Amino acid sequence: MSPELRWSNRGPGYFFEPALGYHVTQYDLKNAVMGEPSTPTRSLPYGRLDAGLVFERAAGSAGQRTQTLEPRMVYSYVPYRNQDELPIFDTALPDLNLTELFRTNRYVGDDRIGDANQLAVGLTTRLFDHVSGAQYLSATIGQIRYFSIPRVTIPEDILRLESGLPVAGLPLVNPLAWPGLFVTNARAPGSQPFPGQTYATPNCQLGANAPGCQIGVITPGQIGVQYPASDIVSEISLTGYKHLSLDLNYQWNPYTSHTDKEEIEVQYHPDSSRVVNLGYRFQEGILKQYDTSFAWPIGGHWNAVGRWVYSLADRTTIEQIAGFEYKSCCYRIQVVQRRYLRRISGGATAGLDTSIALQLELTGLSSVGKPADTFLQKEIRGYTARDPANREIP
């Protein structure tokens, strides 16, 4: 339960929204660990101030476009509460992006509420058609300034180690002060370790019981200089030029002068039945991938679909998808083959597994077989399912 008192003051060119709330959570655990409470509770207040301005000006040779400049700031305060006795069912720490930048709780899920004393600032500019409202450009840059070091953590990476999975962490940004260690769930502030965060030696990548593996918790005395801010996050979206669009997400650490994350995707989407995607993803110490996909008619009744994901870091194919679709006046049939990399204990790979999905759909009746449309909509950005009569399926 989270009752909240909010005041929304909006007008032409500005908004001002302060909020005060109170989180109250109680668990009713049927199989609690001996010695642990079966009905643990947590209660804590929080405050938030969200404010911004919107400036507009005419753009284009005839003033047919409008450009905006939109500064925004969100101050969040959540006091620290020890939540170690609370279970974790569905809580995780998401990647830092512009959506997460302005959230009060840095965790997804209610099992952990992160303490916060921070100010998120962002600046957005948009360019759109004055008459139709069609957007041509959107660009945003933002950063979080921390006034205190976050203390609430989650043990997800320790659980991965105990399960024999690889360490899901980043190398330390200061290897001279912390030689040979890997810090888990590093994100706030920046990629700098902070007290209460778990760490592991490199041998732990072979398993928690491997010789030389040491797992511990960072104490305040082990931390030197703290980063006062997060990475700088930026997003650029270009649309409206001859069915082409470009999306760029970039995350930069100003203290190490390194790129922590980068995503680029180009899409060609001339109509609802044709789409081609070209993408590149990079995340420091985690992944470096190419991702291409398409859906395209190859005849009056035939359509083809495909996707290929290749890891530059591992020099191997992560996923392959190939399929076809045949449509007539009375029925539609789809066959999709998927090959994907299977990982085993310890992070090793066991080659590519193969699965095949078959779906038959009759006009006016339900489909038979696995829902290939749902799968393709998740795998191919811009893919649109169509029935045998060539009508779009919502």
What are these regions (language model features)?
Residues M1-S311, R315-P394:
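Outer-membrane beta-barrel translocator/pore domains, especially the C-terminal barrels
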